[in-house]
Structures are given as C-alpha cells and as structure tokens.
C-alpha cells in the first residue's frame, strides 16, 4: 500500500509505503530542492527516507529533515504512538537524517538510541538531554522478535565518520542511509526505471562516495559477509530492489578505479567546524574531475600519526582546511606531523573554514612555501556565509590542483600516440563555438570545437566536454545552456579571451559583450549565431563526456557569414 499526502505550496510531501513484511517506509519528498550539500545541481529534488519495523519490539531507522517536522510527526503518529517505539537506529547523525531526533526523544524519552560509538557522541551534542543508548560494533545484533533480527555493519566515512548499515535478517533488507542513494524525488518507491535514475545515481556517487572509495570497498567487503541482500533501503531517493546486484556492482567498479589512480591528494580538515565539510567536499569534487584519487582525513577524529605520516608521504598534493585556533592538542599534533612529512615535490592548497575562530591562514601557508611546496591555488578566504559562487570557486581550485599533479602524466599521454595516427586524427576538423551556461548565481564558459549535429527529430547535437572543465558541472542532464557560433574572420578576439587560464572563481565574461538568453545563459554579442539548448543525456567517453542536447531556440546575426573552422595538424590535443 502506498499513501501520498496532497502537495503543499512549498511542495513538501510525505509518502508511506509497505516495502516488506512488518516494514513501512516514511519518505519525506522535497520536490523543489535545487541544491544539496555542495555541488548537487539538482533537477529532481530529493527525499529523506525513514523506516518503521514492527517485531515483538518496534524500531525506527532514522528520522527526517527538520523542515518536515510537522508533516513527519503527523504521519508517524498516524502509524504508531511514538511511545511504543523501543529503538531508534541512527545510521549517522547528519542533520538531514537526524534533524528530528531531539523532538522524538522529547515525545518518547524511553526510546533506546542505537548507533556507533561516534554517532552516540555526536548525538549528545545535538540533543542536549540524557537518553538511553546502545552502542553497536561490527557484527553486533539486535533482536526485535518475530524473526526481525538486525545485524550491524560499521561503514565509516560513507559519507560521515559515524555511519552504520543495518541488516534485517527476516526481510533481507539492508538500511544504508547515504550509501547507494541518490538525490531524486519521485513517488515511485523503487528503482523500476534504471535508465531514468542512473545519471543521478552516478553523480551522487561521484560527489559523495568517490572521495571515500577505500571506505566504499571496505563496506562492500563487510556486506559480502551478510546473507543475500534483497533490498537496499537508502536514505535518499528510490529504494533499490530491482537492480541491487547491478548498482552495488557499479559502486565496486567505480571505487576500484578510484583506488587504482596513479596519483592521490590528501584532504585534511576538522569535520563539523564552520563550513569545513561543505567547502572540502567542493574542493574534492574538483579534484576527482581530473581522475586523481583522494584520501580524506578528519583531523578532529582519532588519527594514527604513523598512518598519517605514510599517507602524506605518498600524496602528490595536499589540501588543508584551517582548524579552530583553540583546537585540541591532537589536532595540532596532526598538523605538525603533516608539516614534518611533506616534500618539495608536492603541491598544497589551503582554505579557511569560516568557523569564526580559524587559525590564521598566512603563517601556515608560509611554512609550506618555506618547505618548498608549490601553491596550487590562491588561499581561499571565507569572510561571510559561503554562496554558490564560493563553492564553485572551491571546485575550480580543486581542479587546478588535480591538473597540476597530473601535468607530467598528461604530457606523457600526449607523446604516447604514434606519429602517423596523431597526424591522421589531426585531420578531423570542426567549427569553433563558445558554450555558455548559468545556474543560479554561477556562470561559466568553454571554447569548443568537438560539436556535431546528431538528430533531426528532435533537433539535437553532441558536444565533447572534458571531465575537468569548469563548465562540466553546469551541464548535467536537464541543465540549459547556449551554444554560441563564432564567425569566420572574426573569431580571434573571443577565442583568445576564452582560451585564457582563469583563476578559480574568476568571471569568464568580464569585458565581453553579452545579453541573457531566455534560459539565463549569456549570449555573446559578437557571435555569428546562438542556440538555446537543454542537456538530454551524457555518455562516459573516458576523459570526456559526450553530451547530447536538444535545441529549442536560436538566431543568426549575419545570414551570409560562415562558421569559423578549427584546423588541426595533430590529434593529441585540441
């Protein structure tokens, strides 16, 4: 049975569904959520999933976002008297899943909270009231009766340090919270249409799970010790039932590829201080676009200094988030270990975390410079609440760092192509275009020549977009942009401008005549023609995305003029 409330003005709804024996999903549907965490440019909203399991005793797995407080508790109390709930299982303490824990404990103070040791510690700081607790370790079990025996899997860093999975042996359902989820809002409970959801599934992995690929593989190994998993009840998006093996297999493949990366960058910061998590995640997103592996270390957690020393030694680059000035001795010890383990061949980037009490950034930056490290991007200084542009700046800074540490590899790859084949590929020619895009307050642009019409009905074309281009994150499925066509004999000024290497966060359109298209993207005043377009699909082509888009509007400024053509002599670069 599925029940769905009427959609409110803000398009926040609650859906309940019986998903297995004695098991009800309570899904908080946020239809218009256009951003989540950092770089999720959502087109399809998101959901926050909670689950009620009734054995001889009753357990609730996770709660919801605080914005759903009234809707969630109206729904929960319609299903059960909260005082009848025996256990609240906390998958992790991120506010979008635990935002209503304090309210629930006030309604039902006899509930026993079940979670990892770290989760219980975090929760004490969130609820500020005594509560019953049960700390679980990997392999521990909780018997609700009537066959509902829960087994717990410790899965740290997916994507919070306190994460656990919970497996119900009776229904063979694995509750994973963020892992295997996606930001996709639909009243279709399960993964029935894989083709529709897989772009969001992949993008979610890239943003949140990819930077913790080793932790993903560890969790998958522990999952392998469980009996067959029939369903994965995720914290976001549709539940996995029809494609469990396929989608867990993709996680394994993607994570194995990440850990095989020839180069890696260490990202070090104090989680849950200021905006550190969000800023670090944006930088990580930029790094991973370059194909570089990432090792994330929370300096606020227990850190083995020998392991830290070894990690720093094998990294080709480092990112440091400024810690609180009054930070614990363990954090200062970890920073001293990092400084004592670096070498002059490495690159470094530093960002303020905006916690209001950051250590000064310049003394630490000077120490790294004095040790001979290259500064890969200008220090990121946070003087006010970060905006979309701040996070875009962070992403671009991460990409700059990733490109710096892979520069030798890129040159080697260019030289590896046979001379004859290189020259033959160079005879493939294309027009010259500028892609412009704008989403919210963030805008970007890219010079392109790999553009080809792909269909008549609908009118569509393909563009090859390198994965490490700044504009790539603005060209997800559903995003809109403008294709500006450059004119033969009049393309040099625009081409020279957009070929410049822009600093992270720089305005690509400064000094360029533009006007806004209906979709908000800039139309270049000196372009020969323009087309307004929407991304329909993307195909992974190694170091590029082949982006197929449809065209719904366009104009030509000079009917007799021709498109500028880019003639190459070799095929190993643009």
Curated annotation (Swiss-Prot):
InterPro entries (alphabetical): Flavin_Rdtase-like_dom, Flavodoxin/NO_synth, Flavoprotein-like_sf, Metallo-B-lactamas, NADH_oxidoreductase_modular, ODP_dom, RibonucZ/Hydroxyglut_hydro, Split_barrel_FMN-bd
Cofactor(s) this protein cannot do without: Fe cation
EC number: 1.-.-.-
One MF term in the entry's GO annotations: oxidoreductase activity, acting on the CH-NH group of donors, NAD or NADP as acceptor
Organism superkingdom: Bacteria
Chain intervals for the UniProt region annotation (Flavodoxin-reductase-like): 410-574
Record's keyword annotation contains Transport: yes
Note from the entry: By homology with NorV in E.coli, could be involved in nitric oxide detoxification.
Function text: Mediates electron transfer from NADH to oxygen, reducing it to water. This modular protein has 3 redox cofactors, in other organisms the same activity requires 2 or 3 proteins.
Protein name (Swiss-Prot/TrEMBL): Putative diflavin flavoprotein A 3
Organism: Nostoc sp. (strain PCC 7120 / SAG 25.82 / UTEX 2576)
